[in-house]
């Protein structure tokens, strides 16, 4: 059963808000440059991937990750990196299955954050977020055929 377009948009907004709100508010009350800010970044993604009450029902935490990164506003470089690599591996170098695409996307995202972002708490938080998402995709990855194409060319 499908809820339709409006239900999908509302779900997307709620998933993004789940990550955005705690991080955005957290940076108002905590020093973003301090290590206590790392759990604020990681908790929404961890909670989505490994829910306390439904142990086997966790998601892959991609949308929650975007919400967390958008919550870092005005520092949006990490969110832009993640969006860039998702678009790149979905449109330019197309990698299937989706789980492998997500693993590579979050790997490249973490690497770029480590190279370009100078705030240690953001580096550590993004690295842990990438690890959580990669782990979730590895344990749910099917060993089907891997297809890579460039701009829809085989």
Predicted features and spans:
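Alpha-helical transmembrane segments and their lipid-water interface positions
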Residues: 22, 51-55, 140-141
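Cytosolic, membrane-interface loops and tails of multi-pass inner-membrane proteins
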Residues: 1-8, 58, 142-154
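Interfacial segments of multi-pass membrane proteins
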Residues: 1-3, 26-29, 47, 62-95, ...
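Loop-to-transmembrane alpha-helix initiation sites
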Residues: 77-84, 98-106, 117-130
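Multi-pass membrane catalytic core of lipid/isoprenoid biosynthesis enzymes
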Residues: 1-27
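Alpha-helical transmembrane segments of multi-pass membrane proteins, especially transporters
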Residues: 11-15, 36-44, 60-68, 81, ...
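Membrane-helix interface "capping/anchor" motifs
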Residues: 51-60, 91-104
